Amino acid sequence: MPLIPYALTRPFLFGLDAEHAHELTLASIARLQNTPLQCLWQQPRIDDPVTLAGVRFPNRIGLAAGLDKNGRCIDGFGAMGFGFIEVGTVTPKGQPGNPKPRIFRLPQAEALINRLGFNNDGLDAFLANVRRAGFRQGGGVLGLNIGKNAATPIEDAVDDYLLGLEGVYPHADYVTVNISSPNTQNLRSLQSDAALDALLGRLQERRQQLIARHGRSVPMFVKIAPDLDEAQVDVIAATLKKNAVDGVIATNTTLSRDAVRGQAHATEVGGLSGRPVFEASNRVVGQLRAALGAGYPIIGVGGVMSGADARAKRDVGADVVQIYTGLIYRGPALVSEAARALKG
């Protein structure tokens, strides 16, 4: 158990502006990771190994991308017991993201709305942080999530993804291609049939070159949205298989507000995460499993607020599970709770 129960620190954090609390938490973890004070949140990693896409995951619970966009706190989050950690989304050039305020809590629904817009320090700073981290050397799996700059026209998006893939490839256990954030204009259009096929074709061509150059095969995952109908999911699944993509992450945040109507901040623009996205995410995971068949790697994410939620996501077809908003509402104890629920 962490030395300081999260129930004692959450009221203080929730009394702050949501983004300020987020930045304060990251700054504290970055400062204290790999020091004796890491014991404040440290807990043992549950041992439950599973191999996906040729990568051995020490357990089935991971941190979703977006919480640590610049990879500043990899070892600190690793100390919470995660088997795998995904950092980013990183873009080739640093960018400030959308104007503040841009993160909103909906406590009644155990949810967040964000319209951050891929705010990050850029690829060079990101890779410097990744190189400093010892998480991989300790057996953890590190996923690096890449996206496009807001200033890059959508028709040139592939160039940004190629730059990202080139940069992160030597340092990643897997690479995630993020085409599903609702906060970068037109990004989700890359999920459409022809656009996705063209993007993945170019990325796989470059990946084969990188395999030859580095002498190792780093699997590539694609992260998709929950706001897709069954026909769209089937098209995406077929396109993933056609382009020999190693796995899929389902899902990102939702644009739907059906579950939070009438609540404070419910009308804010951005992606909704947390408990309200759980069912939509599980629906997409289940549809992907049916379309892709047994054995195709699926990382499930969206609305996991308890160990039972994590198990339910595995039961509908996810091989491993990620959390983000649940960590904000429940704290580090959720990591071990979910890992135990997913075991076996």
From Swiss-Prot:
<feature type="binding site">
    <location>
        <position position="274"/>
    </location>
    <ligand>
        <name>FMN</name>
    </ligand>
</feature>
<dbReference type="GO" id="GO:0005737">
    <property type="term" value="C:cytoplasm"/>
</dbReference>
<feature type="binding site">
    <location>
        <position position="178"/>
    </location>
    <ligand>
        <name>substrate</name>
    </ligand>
</feature>
<dbReference type="GO" id="GO:0005886">
    <property type="term" value="C:plasma membrane"/>
</dbReference>
<dbReference type="Pfam" id="PF01180">
    <property type="entry name" value="DHO_dh"/>
</dbReference>
<feature type="active site" description="Nucleophile">
    <location>
        <position position="181"/>
    </location>
</feature>
<dbReference type="InterPro" id="IPR005720">
    <property type="entry name" value="Dihydroorotate_DH_cat"/>
</dbReference>
<feature type="binding site">
    <location>
        <begin position="114"/>
        <end position="118"/>
    </location>
    <ligand>
        <name>substrate</name>
    </ligand>
</feature>
<comment type="subunit">
    <text>Monomer.</text>
</comment>
<keyword id="KW-0665">Pyrimidine biosynthesis</keyword>
<feature type="binding site">
    <location>
        <begin position="324"/>
        <end position="325"/>
    </location>
    <ligand>
        <name>FMN</name>
    </ligand>
</feature>
<comment type="pathway">
    <text>Pyrimidine metabolism; UMP biosynthesis via de novo pathway; orotate from (S)-dihydroorotate (quinone route): step 1/1.</text>
</comment>
<dbReference type="InterPro" id="IPR050074">
    <property type="entry name" value="DHO_dehydrogenase"/>
</dbReference>
<dbReference type="InterPro" id="IPR005719">
    <property type="entry name" value="Dihydroorotate_DH_2"/>
</dbReference>
<keyword id="KW-0560">Oxidoreductase</keyword>
<keyword id="KW-0472">Membrane</keyword>
<keyword id="KW-0285">Flavoprotein</keyword>
<feature type="binding site">
    <location>
        <position position="69"/>
    </location>
    <ligand>
        <name>substrate</name>
    </ligand>
</feature>
<dbReference type="GO" id="GO:0106430">
    <property type="term" value="F:dihydroorotate dehydrogenase (quinone) activity"/>
</dbReference>
<feature type="binding site">
    <location>
        <position position="183"/>
    </location>
    <ligand>
        <name>substrate</name>
    </ligand>
</feature>
<dbReference type="GO" id="GO:0044205">
    <property type="term" value="P:'de novo' UMP biosynthetic process"/>
</dbReference>
<feature type="binding site">
    <location>
        <position position="303"/>
    </location>
    <ligand>
        <name>FMN</name>
    </ligand>
</feature>
<feature type="binding site">
    <location>
        <position position="223"/>
    </location>
    <ligand>
        <name>FMN</name>
    </ligand>
</feature>
<comment type="function">
    <text>Catalyzes the conversion of dihydroorotate to orotate with quinone as electron acceptor.</text>
</comment>
<dbReference type="InterPro" id="IPR001295">
    <property type="entry name" value="Dihydroorotate_DH_CS"/>
</dbReference>
<keyword id="KW-1003">Cell membrane</keyword>
<feature type="binding site">
    <location>
        <begin position="252"/>
        <end position="253"/>
    </location>
    <ligand>
        <name>substrate</name>
    </ligand>
</feature>
<protein>
    <recommendedName>
        <fullName>Dihydroorotate dehydrogenase (quinone)</fullName>
        <ecNumber>1.3.5.2</ecNumber>
    </recommendedName>
</protein>
<dbReference type="GO" id="GO:0006207">
    <property type="term" value="P:'de novo' pyrimidine nucleobase biosynthetic process"/>
</dbReference>
<comment type="similarity">
    <text>Belongs to the dihydroorotate dehydrogenase family. Type 2 subfamily.</text>
</comment>
<dbReference type="InterPro" id="IPR013785">
    <property type="entry name" value="Aldolase_TIM"/>
</dbReference>
<feature type="binding site">
    <location>
        <position position="251"/>
    </location>
    <ligand>
        <name>FMN</name>
    </ligand>
</feature>
<keyword id="KW-0288">FMN</keyword>
<feature type="binding site">
    <location>
        <begin position="65"/>
        <end position="69"/>
    </location>
    <ligand>
        <name>FMN</name>
    </ligand>
</feature>
<feature type="binding site">
    <location>
        <position position="89"/>
    </location>
    <ligand>
        <name>FMN</name>
    </ligand>
</feature>
<feature type="binding site">
    <location>
        <position position="178"/>
    </location>
    <ligand>
        <name>FMN</name>
    </ligand>
</feature>
<dbReference type="InterPro" id="IPR012135">
    <property type="entry name" value="Dihydroorotate_DH_1_2"/>
</dbReference>
<feature type="binding site">
    <location>
        <position position="145"/>
    </location>
    <ligand>
        <name>FMN</name>
    </ligand>
</feature>
